[in-house]
Amino acid sequence: MEISQFNPAQIDEVARMAASVWGKEQGAHGAEVARVFCGHLSRYSLYSSELALQAVDEDGLQTITFAWMPGDTNDADVWVRNQFTTLSEEERNTLLTNENYLKRIDAEILAKMVPNSAKLSFFISRKKGYGTPVLNALIERLRSRGVEWLYLWTDCTCNWQYYVNHGYEKIGEGVAPEFSTDKEDYTYYMFWKRIL
């Protein structure tokens, strides 16, 4: 396994990785919605290639982790709206609901962030044992910038227990009514960890 800085030209491959996890849910809305959702999620999470790392081995790209600092921006909103031309109104509304969810929870965690902090915005790994070394390398990069706290949010579609098991403290949780059903709440969780 080789850990290196992520090349933004590979963002479509990251979207395909995301589709293997989150695309299944979106697939209920159609293959094109799943493709656009995962493409948007990947682009929405990438702010700075300097705070984006990857693990590659003989089988290709295996792990990705992105972070952002308060004030960072990207053009994910423009990208997703450029995809709307081929979608129905219902499909566009599905994607806008997802975008609003991402922005709402990001705003919620941003309100909790203290000075000298960053947010882990994306973390996915295909191979067991690859994720933690890549995340640790990103944390080292953040430490070199003087970042003291790492924040993140995740939800019930992810392995949120990973963070509990790796020393992150839960600082909040909530229910997303737009994705909840009568039988099950769609829960999201917020964590932080002192890294410096």
Task: Give residue ranges: language-model regions.
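A short beta-loop-alpha structural element at the N-terminal edge
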Residues: M1-R16, G27
